[in-house]
Design a protein with these regions (language model features):
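Catalytic domains of carbohydrate-active enzymes, especially glycoside hydrolases
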Residues: 1-18, 86-87
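Hydrophobic faces of well-ordered beta-strands that scaffold small-molecule active sites
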Residues: 13-15, 70-72, 89-93, 114-116, ...
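Short helix-capping segments at alpha-helix termini
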Residues: 65-66, 135-141
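Active-site beta->alpha loop and helix N-cap motifs at the rims of alpha/beta catalytic domains
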Residues: 35-96, 100
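Anion (oxyanion) recognition and catalysis
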Residues: 6, 64, 108
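Glycine-rich, proline-tolerant flexible connector loops at the mouths of alpha/beta enzymes
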Residues: 11-50
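Active-site-adjacent beta->alpha loops and helix N-cap segments on the catalytic face
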Residues: 23-28, 53-56, 79-81, 93-111, ...
């Protein structure tokens, strides 16, 4: 993906970061799934496909080598904290997390640019998230 984006003249590539133990619902964690690695629980599968520090260090190194910047969307507070170890140009909040006040305010407090994804959100949810982003939870209430 990085190579294709660099050749195409893109400025950034974006990944996603999740803590599967937080993001996988309890009722799905032990469900057995067929995966490319055989049968395993859904939680084990999600851990297998999730990038860790080694992979993100390589992404960081390779993007620098290719002259392209990168970022990632954190799906939980652990992931935001993890991503803060990198010099990311922005943080993109996934649309599924647009109603997560704690995550949006914490992203705001990093001092980095924050992009809010709004797919499938109501206008009220967008306005509320925007207020959290602008006012850090201290601003106008709806």
């Amino acid at each position: 993906m990085i190579d294709i984006a660099a050749v195409a003249g893109c400025d950034y590539v974006k990944f996603q970061k999740r803590n599967p133990n937080i993001c996988v619902p309890e009722h799905q964690k032990n469900v057995i799934r067929d995966t490319p690695w055989g049968k395993m629980t859904y939680l084990d599968y999600k851990y297998k496909v999730e990038f860790g520090k080694e992979e993100y260090d390589e992404i960081n190194r390779y993007c620098k080598e290719k002259g392209i910047e990168w970022s990632a969307s954190p799906w939980d507070m652990d992931s935001l904290e993890f991503l803060n170890q990198y010099d990311l140009p922005y943080i993109k909040i996934p649309s599924a997390m647009l109603t997560n006040e704690e995550l949006i305010i914490a992203a705001r407090n990093t001092g980095k640019k924050v992009i809010l994804s709004t797919g499938m959100s109501t206008w009220r949810e967008i306005e509320t998230a925007n207020n959290w982003l602008i006012h850090g939870g201290e601003g106008p209430k709806q």
